[in-house]
């Protein structure tokens, strides 16, 4: 914006972009002829103007800023954006199938990795200083998985009891599936389903490391494996595909790959998934629908639409406890 350049960049425009970057970073420009006419004062003045505008300050596309305001309101959207632009903490979930949170904290401390417990999250530890956890013996032995604190809230909502038949229908590589296994204490049956075979292969590898032996994976190639489970599941987790707007701090570049067209398609897919998988649940069973988006149109509004549908009319939304 300040360099007044647009893609695809020409050679001259690249010099202008470099000049703007250097001036704003306080770097003295080299005496190269391409930089002789750099307007330092104008660059700084223009920056001071733009930094007051949210879409520039928070670095988001125009359409996304409008969408956020429309769905959340000015104040809440501004607060969410500010939080999403903060550096993400490294959070782990201790694998209770193998060890305890105190033991993992002690083991990591011996490897010069300091952690803190998080109030309200019984299996979570936060790293005081970011370090490579994948090289630790504790990770290699399956004592923990890296999993955001908010993600660790999802599985407990299912209120699992030992011996239940549980289905995770958008399992992916299985972060929440492994948590379900730990909560079930390796008893009962967990069916992890996904359309991507390679992700389920990774889940199998992780499950072996975690000593999670009650997980069965099934690749969804058609509707047959879904319909076979109609009326047979005690607990159903739909960790639905979404825009990912709630985890931009983990993957900030993804916002530039999103579009309204994609968002509309993903909303349609979310409702289709609810309609297709909800009949799996037994009478008096429970369904948890989760996304990593902050948009009501991907969360509350999807649930409200489902509850008004023919398939969803017999479901009742529970209040958060």
Report residues per predicted region.
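Rossmann-like S-adenosyl-L-methionine
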Residues: 102-321
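Class I Rossmann-like S-adenosyl-L-methionine
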Residues: 1-134, 232
